[in-house]
Amino acid sequence: MNNLNSENMCNCCNSANSCGGTNGISWDREKCEYCGPCAIKCPNDAIMVVNPKGLELPSRAKTERANEFKMCDLCGTCVSACPTEALQMGKIVHNEKEYDRIEFTPSLCDSCGACVEICPQNVLKLNEEYKLKGFCVMCLKCIDACDKTNQNALSLK
């Protein structure tokens, strides 16, 4: 599954080539070369890329798939599904503009997995060390990594 529906339209903003919610990070599939620095730099594993050689990043697992991109699009489905309110929609300011972001309070998380099961992008993961990974905190490290490749496939909306 990726962020595009069967008509190759973004599930959240309904545009043809970009994805990333209505107020966050936009992905332009026409510019993307699936090279993966964005996934590697993301501190919360909110991006998964399968490169042309079939290497899934950031995990570096070999797969038969190729050229796949998934990211947290800040849709808030996980927040709605969380029975303990460990996940909340928050705000962050970049360049004087306010953006949505997901905030996580580990002490409230009961590891029920409701958020993981309902995530439409299939990027959330429960683990023992951090409890939950895969949600976007809008740190913008992915955009910086993509800019360094001169692809500019990721940008702020």
UniProtKB/Swiss-Prot annotation:
Binding annotation for [4Fe-4S] cluster: 32, 35, 38, 42, 72, 75, 78, 82, 109, 112, 115, 119, 136, 139, 142, 146
Annotated SUPFAM superfamilies: 4Fe-4S ferredoxins
Keyword terms of this UniProt record: 4Fe-4S, Electron transport, Iron, Iron-sulfur, Metal-binding, Repeat, Transport
One of the record's GO molecular function terms: 4 iron, 4 sulfur cluster binding
Cofactor(s) needed for function: [4Fe-4S] cluster
Cofactor note: Binds 4 [4Fe-4S] clusters.
CDD domains reported in the protein's UniProt record: MtMvhB_like
Record has Membrane as a keyword: no
InterPro entries to which the protein is assigned, alphabetical: 4Fe4S_Fe-S-bd, 4Fe4S_Fe_S_CS, Polyferredoxin-like_ET
Domain (4Fe-4S ferredoxin-type) ranges: 23-52, 62-92, 100-129
Pfam families named in the record: Fer4, Fer4_7
PANTHER family: POLYFERREDOXIN PROTEIN FWDF, PTHR43193
Name this protein carries in UniProt: Polyferredoxin protein VhcB
Record lineage: Archaea, Methanobacteriati, Methanobacteriota, Methanomada group, Methanococci
